Amino acid sequence: MQNLNSKILAIDFGTKIIGTAINDINLNLCLPYCEITNNELKFKKILEIVEEENIKEIVIGFPKTQNSYVSERHQLIIDFKNQLSELLKNKNIEICFFDESYSTKSSKESLMNFNVKTSKLKKNKDMIAASIILENYLASKK
């Protein structure tokens, strides 16, 4: 585990959209960052974020299961992590999974509590989910 005073990128992996969030080490906040279309350019965009934001650790949301069953969605996330690890192998960046159970549902509920319109809710839910994953990850390290 990296120092909690270093920048961390959280990823909420989706088959269409990848939500991201980063921590602000000065304000001790987790902030939605951007959404990335899950296509052949996704790794290029993630590498840009890593460089621009001086990321030292990446946390990828991974749905917890009651048993050891690996679904197709689990395998997609595992493959994504493996590809990302290969691309970043010379950068000394730790990549780990963290339970993302209910993060997307929680993001929708949070936005609804602030009376966010349905169209904006759909647009921002993946970034908010990544923020929730990052908040929970950081809380687990304290």
Curated annotation (Swiss-Prot):
Major subcellular site: cytoplasm
GO MF annotation terms: nuclease activity
InterPro entries (alphabetical): RNaseH-like_sf (IPR012337), YqgF (IPR005227), YqgF/RNaseH-like_dom (IPR006641), YqgF/RNaseH-like_dom_sf (IPR037027)
Annotated localization: Cytoplasm
Broad enzyme group: hydrolase
CDD domains (UniProt xref): YqgF (cd16964)
Top-level taxonomic group: Bacteria
One GO cellular component, as annotated: cytosol
One Gene Ontology term from the biological process aspect of the record: rRNA 5'-end processing
Keyword line: Cytoplasm, Hydrolase, Nuclease, Ribosome biogenesis
EC number in record: 3.1.-.-
Homology family: Belongs to the YqgF nuclease family.
Biological role stated in the UniProt entry: Could be a nuclease involved in processing of the 5'-end of pre-16S rRNA.
Name of the protein described by the UniProt record: Putative pre-16S rRNA nuclease
